[in-house]
Structure formats: structure tokens, C-alpha cells
Amino acid sequence: MAKGIRDKIKLVSSAGTGHFYTTTKNKRTMPEKLEMKKFDPVVRQHVMYKEAKIK
């Protein structure tokens, strides 16, 4: 079987709470690291989430 072109990634909160989201990303069309603003339920506000590898 062929290896898929989508990688599993983890989006970690920049607020330092340890909260994270998991998602997939197409590594061929988006080689740069993903950053997006999402809701952090620990601090109850929208903060920047940055891409990290899933261990």
C-alpha cells in the first residue's frame, strides 16, 4: 500500500496551558508550519495554536 500524503499533526496552545488539538495536513501543498487562532477552554479565550509533531 502507498503511504498517504497527509500527516497527523498536533496544534499546541501558545498560552502555555498544555491544551492541544489534533488534525491532519497535506505536506505537499503546505510544507510550512501551521499556525491558527482557536479557542483554548482552559483560559476561555481565543489564542494562537502552533504546529508540533505527534510523538
UniProtKB/Swiss-Prot annotation:
Listed GO CC annotations: cytosolic large ribosomal subunit
Asked if the keyword RNA-binding belongs to this entry, the reply reads: no
Q: Which residues form a coiled coil?
A: none
Gene3D superfamilies, per the entry: Ribosomal protein L33
Q: Name one GO biological process term.
A: translation
Keywords attached to this entry = Ribonucleoprotein, Ribosomal protein
Put simply, this protein is called Large ribosomal subunit protein bL33
